[in-house]
Amino acid sequence: PSPAPPSPVPSPSSGWSTDIGHLLLSPTRTYAPVLKRLLTEKFADIHGLVHCSGGGQTKCMKYLPGDFLVIKDNLFAPPPVFEIIQRASGSDAREMYQVFNMGHRLEIFTTPGAAEELIAISHSFGIDARIVGRVEPASKKSLILKTPSGDILFDL
């Protein structure tokens, strides 16, 4: 049997503040001005940059320089467009976080001591930023995501 068709796309009348067309066609914010300043002023504090599109929240695992556990336990709430995609596709949370950035387009790996300065620079451009997790030594490359759907573990 064929799977049931996806449920209708939400509209503003169903509690969403915008329609699907506006969500999908809204421009993506560029991080170029922020990155220029960060790389100019704080280059030594930046240990890694990961653009999470095209690999989602697991993309960081490709660039770990050894066996480490990445724990992302303070993620931003996913924007509504990802709930729409999840409902329409029938994907589970694991697949969503593996495929999509879930609203986290850029990650900067740094030390705890430098993080607040980097966040302040981001805020000076009107871009929200925060510490979303930490990296710990481990016996293999692993990632734990703490999401509204529960903890999700990825191992390499």
What does each model-identified segment do?
Residues S2-V9, S13-L25, R29-L156:
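Glycine-/charge-enriched secondary-structure boundary and capping motifs
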